[in-house]
A protein has these predicted regions:
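Positively charged n-region of N-terminal signal peptides that target proteins for export
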Residues: 1-6
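Bacterial N-terminal signal peptides
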Residues: 7-16
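Acidic, contiguous N-terminal accessory segments
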Residues: 21-143, 337-338, 342-344, 359-360, ...
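Conserved short loop/turn motifs at secondary-structure junctions
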Residues: 22, 198-202, 405
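Substrate-binding groove of N-acetylhexosamine-processing glycoside hydrolases
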Residues: 31-47, 55, 61-62, 152, ...
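Feature activates predominantly on carbohydrate-active enzymes
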Residues: 35, 89-329
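Short, solvent-exposed amphipathic alpha-helical segments in soluble enzyme
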Residues: 66-70, 120-122, 170-171, 390-394, ...
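A generic structural motif
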Residues: 71-86, 131-134, 183-190, 402-410, ...
């Protein structure tokens, strides 16, 4: 049998292949994202995907999804109780064995079975030689796999311009790429019953829509985490836009915000905390009571409110975060927040890294409850060390490393997270959830978080991009898309005329 052996520590593109014997001329391996820890697949020997053996715990989920993916050609699902008790396997660990006798999945949990099925879907192709699909085949071989980082998350923004299908597609892609958490940040788009004025009138992030997305996420094995900004970014809008999702339409609520642009919440106003606590409880319940809640906390301004300025701001800041954290803890969740306001700008220890805090906020941070999770964001290229991560870890906090769209940075930060033993990685997307950025972010992030020590290409070339497009197309089938605008990664194949460079 002619095999490709994927030795991931010396990976070239998605795989580096060492082939026993002569491979078929021009044969191209199918890509698996994220890269499995160990994978050996044939280039030429295939098995019909008409029967699969799984443990009892995953039986109903597997049967449902195979029917959804493959319709009348769905493989028969067989339960083997002998593979259910894989005591040596971790909760997310699986093994796939494909030979002439069929396909067997070894795993001990539903989540691991899900991951095995996502892998199989990426390597299954229609039987050849027919006009329409009449069956499926998979390459023979063996895959053994498990994640190297525990918390593998992505941060998704829901802007006023964002349509619900775009959020759903990102959730589905994150789950397909074996991420286990997705933070959903509303940018004035959550329709609140507690404070109907707090957001844009045409908000699309309704409780009904969240319930629908949560059901999808739960089924696919990814947990949704809500976010409300409780310090800076109170405008729920990008700074460059100059908008304020509350005050532009409802100026009577100005006392809740700092006078300077309303960018900060007013921490000295007791009504501010009362409102935020009510909003947090509402959002937490809308998201089905998840284990975490993100409170933002980045890029705040110095106080312009005379009441805030006249008080020891370090104490005001500390009391505010303590109260918010106590509310979240009482709900049964842990607080997550960005790091940049927690260290002092001008401190030479942080030169070259993201620092927006003052002496006051840095001092207040030292007294924070240690159950808060610090989300350390850095969006530039690879660094040999990340002193801010080390600092927060040394202070006794759980830490997540948070890259954005720099491929080298995503890889380096994921490797540093793995090496330093912190909680994990939370990749960010911001307003780059379409076009060329989408394949770059999700491909690099998924691979770096799952198997950080593997070689991962920093050049998202046509081959890699096309494989991501293939996976996005599969997600489009799951979403039963009909609108051509919802296909691919660009809304339009040719940009509008003013943007054409003739």
């Amino acid at each position: 049998m002619q095999y490709i052996k994927y030795a991931f520590l010396c990976l070239l593109l998605t795989f580096v292949c060492s082939v026993e014997g002569r491979a078929t001329s021009g044969a191209v391996p199918l890509a698996i994202y994220p890269q499995p820890l160990s994978c050996e697949l044939s280039l030429t020997e295939y098995t019909p995907f008409d029967r699969i053996v799984v443990c009892a715990e995953g039986h109903s989920w597997v049967a449902k999804h195979l029917k959804s993916w493959y319709g009348k050609c769905a493989p028969q699902v067989v339960v083997d109780d002998n593979i259910a008790n894989e005591s040596a396997f971790g909760d997310e660990e699986y093994e796939i064995i494909i030979d002439s006798e069929g396909i067997k999945v070894r795993a001990r949990s539903l989540q691991a079975v899900r991951y095995a099925l996502y892998t199989l879907r990426q390597i299954a192709i229609p039987s050849r030689g027919t006009e329409q699909v009449e069956g499926w085949i998979v390459p023979q071989g063996r895959i053994k796999d498990k994640p190297q980082i525990e918390f593998r998350g992505v941060h998704i923004c829901w802007f006023r311009e964002t349509e619900p299908w775009e959020v759903e597609r990102q959730i589905r892609l994150a789950a397909y790429y074996k991420m286990n958490y997705a933070v959903i940040e509303s940018w004035g788009t959550f329709k609140s019953d507690v404070a109907p004025w707090f957001g844009w009138p045409d908000a699309t992030m309704t409780k009904r829509e969240i319930k629908r997305l949560k059901a999808i996420a739960d089924d696919l094995g990814i947990t949704l985490i809500p976010q409300i900004n409780v310090f800076g970014h109170a405008s729920q809008a990008r700074g460059y836009a100059g908008k304020h999702a509350a005050l532009d339409i409802n100026p009577r609520y100005q006392p809740l915000f700092e006078p300077l642009a309303g960018w900060n919440w007013c921490l000295s106003n007791p009504e501010t905390r009362k409102l935020l606590q009510a909003l947090i409880k509402e959002r937490y319940e809308a998201f089905g009571c998840p284990p975490y809640f993100h409170i933002g906390g980045d890029e705040a301004h110095q106080p312009s409110c005379p009441d805030c300025a006249s008080k020891p701001y370090s104490q005001l800041f500390l009391e505010h975060i303590e109260a918010i954290n106590e509310t979240i803890s009482s709900l049964g969740a842990r607080t997550m927040m960005w790091h940049d306001m927690l260290i002092e700008r001008g401190d030479s220890r942080w030169q070259g890294f993201v620092v927006n805090g003052s002496k006051e906020t840095a001092a207040g941070f030292l007294k924070f409850p240690r159950d808060i999770i610090i989300c350390d964001w850095y969006y530039d290229g690879a660094q040999s060390a990340y002193p801010t991560i080390d600092y927060f870890k040394e202070q006794g906090f759980s830490v997540l490393s948070c890259p954005w769209n720099n491929t080298g940075g995503i890889i380096a930060q994921s490797r540093y997270a793995h090496k330093s033993g912190i909680m994990g990685v939370l990749g960010t997307t911001w307003h780059h959830y379409f076009g060329g950025s989408l394949p770059n972010i999700y491909y690099t992030l998924a691979n770096a978080m799952w198997n950080p020590e593997a070689h991962i290409s920093t050049s998202v070339n046509d081959y890699i991009r096309q494989m991501v497009h293939t996976h996005i197309r599969q997600i489009g089938w799951d979403m039963k898309l009909k609108n051509p605008r919802h296909a691919g990664t660009y809304y339009e194949e040719i940009p509008p005329e003013p943007f054409l460079n003739n």
